[in-house]
Amino acid sequence: MEEELKCPVCGSLFREPIILPCSHNVCLPCARTIAVQTPDGEQHLPQPLLLSRGSGLQAGAAAAASLEHDAAAGPACGGAGGSAAGGLGGGAGGGGDHADKLSLYSETDSGYGSYTPSLKSPNGVRVLPMVPAPPGSSAAAARGAACSSLSSSSSSITCPQCHRSASLDHRGLRGFQRNRLLEAIVQRYQQGRGAVPGTSAAAAVAICQLCDRTPPEPAATLCEQCDVLYCSACQLKCHPSRGPFAKHRLVQPPPPPPPPAEAASGPTGTAQGAPSGGGGCKSPGGAGAGATGGSTARKFPTCPEHEMENYSMYCVSCRTPVCYLCLEEGRHAKHEVKPLGAMWKQHKAQLSQALNGVSDKAKEAKEFLVQLKNILQQIQENGLDYEACLVAQCDALVDALTRQKAKLLTKVTKEREHKLKMVWDQINHCTLKLRQSTGLMEYCLEVIKENDPSGFLQISDALIKRVQVSQEQWVKGALEPKVSAEFDLTLDSEPLLQAIHQLDFIQMKCRVPPVPLLQLEKCCTRNNSVTLAWRMPPFTHSPVDGYILELDDGAGGQFREVYVGKETLCTIDGLHFNSTYNARVKAFNSSGVGPYSKTVVLQTSDVAWFTFDPNSGHRDIILSNDNQTATCSSYDDRVVLGTAAFSKGVHYWELHVDRYDNHPDPAFGVARASVVKDMMLGKDDKAWAMYVDNNRSWFMHCNSHTNRTEGGVCKGATVGVLLDLNKHTLTFFINGQQQGPTAFSHVDGVFMPALSLNRNVQVTLHTGLEVPTNLGRPKLSGN
């Protein structure tokens, strides 16, 4: 877990961590060193002086802190805001950094962008030296000049991990929220490791927060307005008692923090500097959390924009805790908000659920490591077995095989070393992933233990995403050995003595699978579906990864793949009726695809057998008699479809009227699967139908009524539907006699039998019928 608690800039445990807009964390002192100015601000600054590494960092940190206080004071800086980059130079000139400046200039207008590291900025972090003061000028004058130059400039900070840059507003680095949970976890982690003997006295003394000495000097004063601890030298350099600091009150450092037991019982890392009334500044977190401990810690975290208000709600749009003033008068006024406690519990539950997945993967990884170690032992044992066998065979041919024996032993050893290397590489890789996942899991568990809802919600989204990414890295093949413990080597000792010098290992290479055998006794057809079964021939030693089943189009066309997988039984539905299909299958493995099997010919049913489909019918439709009888519970017309779909061939089915009350208008015909089901069939463009009462009938499509024909239905009548997709026509019959002319021509596509009726009608479906040859002539239509 320690890697989760280290700053990506300094590599040490986090000190006063702040949360960047990209959800990554960085120490506040480190943030001051990596903050940069945009080109608008850089053009007002003098050419920076090249400093040594130590003096540059020291002066940069001191100037940044000093200018942060000056900016907060207000009058001296002319409203330059709290830019933490105020004491930093404009960056060294040159081709590499010039591209970086252009990148920042084009993206930080939006407050968020990306940053591409140049040759002069390794790891994506630019640490700029401070602007030197003009010769002979005082420190205050230098700060005043720097502040005046910053009044018309803006600054940005680049994340050292994802290289995204974010603009700093008038508050500077104080505008970023402090990660109180991470700070508390770091403190608890340090206490858990235990203090080194002889360092307890030093740890009990408050230290200067601006010293870059190792170790830092003890703090001599604490500014109540800035909430920063200073040693004597840093106080004179960074916080002189003149200018905007003249009204600041310097006091003695607070007492040391309580023992670990007391610190664990109270809130940690939440202290903020006390607000002042006269333009005083307050760094985010300041020294209160790190030095004063429980003596100045607040019980509840406060809103950075309304410092006297506690967090009470959670803004869903901005994903941040807010106070009630933010909702009434701030930028969150019209945003969606939810109770803080509810969102805290919800995000904790999400993180816990994600952790369960990572925990399962970690458990599998541990078991996998055990398996790999067993493979190591098996490889050793199998290698020894092969060596012993080889020695025995070579001893039988002492005179002729002496020199050849050494060569063969070398090959076995190389094979063994290769396998061992592969397994060790996989162990190291898996161990690294496991350690990363375990560290992340321990860190997340520590986060869950915290009882700070707002702090938790500040980092929960990022943690959930990281946990999900960590879970996704354990892909399917990651927990499978890359090599086998078996040695695919065989020594053939049969050849004659004259062939001894050609004696070598026969390595069994993976070959393509042989031809699969179709199991014709298990292959069958039912209605418009076919089932095929196959198996591999006996004594097949080649591995099989899967099979490919191919089927033609039922008209002698080209084959196409209809199934790819490991099963040896497959059923294909939705084929054409009265059609002949050819099928074949082949196997494949890592070496390639094997040859095709013999082709099997399958004939689908000559006629269609189907029922009403309970899944596609309207909810008011009532089906019975094994889904062959339909009625309705509503007085309105409702639609039900059949289970078959037709796109070619000639099909005929009949519907027997079991009940007919109060002269309703049932409709019979065909429709697309997307037909509207809460009105009469034929009123939309997805259905072609004939609706009929007790006296006459009409054809209807797109709500267009045509071909009124005398003759209706009653109880006991039979309505026939003839769909001829070879001629693309639809014809209707009543009691064996054609009703009117051909109802519709030029019908093309996929159609399903359809029916609409209300509660006054009940019909029974009869399918599997041959097309009648003795149908009567059509009745003349009335129009």
Curated annotation (Swiss-Prot):
Zn(2+) binds at residues 303, 306, 326, 332. This is Tripartite motif-containing protein 67. Residues 448-506 form the COS domain. InterPro entries: B30.2/SPRY, B30.2/SPRY_sf, Bbox_C, ConA-like_dom_sf, COS_domain, E3_ligase_FN3/SPRY, FN3_dom, FN3_sf. It is found in: Cytoplasm; Cytoplasm, Cytoskeleton. Belongs to the TRIM/RBCC family. Residues 589-780 form the B30.2/SPRY domain. The lineage of its organism: Eukaryota, Metazoa, Chordata, Craniata, Vertebrata. GO terms for cellular component: cytoplasm; cytoskeleton. Residues 275-293 have a biased composition (Gly residues). GO terms for biological process: negative regulation of Ras protein signal transduction; positive regulation of neuron projection development; positive regulation of ubiquitin-dependent protein catabolic process; regulation of protein localization. It holds the Pfam family ANCHR-like_BBOX. The keyword Ribosomal protein does not apply. A zinc finger (RING-type) spans 7-42. Residues 513-607 form the Fibronectin type-III domain. CDD domains: Bbox1_TRIM67_C-I, Bbox2_TRIM67_C-I, FN3, RING-HC_TRIM67, SPRY_PRY_TRIM67_9. Residues 252-261 have a biased composition (Pro residues). Transmembrane segments: none annotated. PROSITE patterns: B302_SPRY (PS50188), COS (PS51262), FN3 (PS50853), ZF_BBOX (PS50119), ZF_RING_1 (PS00518). It comes from Homo sapiens (Human). One of its GO terms (molecular function) is zinc ion binding. Residues 247-295 are annotated as: Disordered. A zinc finger (B box-type) spans 206-253, 298-340. Residues 345-382 form a coiled coil. Keywords: Coiled coil, Cytoplasm, Cytoskeleton, Metal-binding, Repeat, Zinc, Zinc-finger.
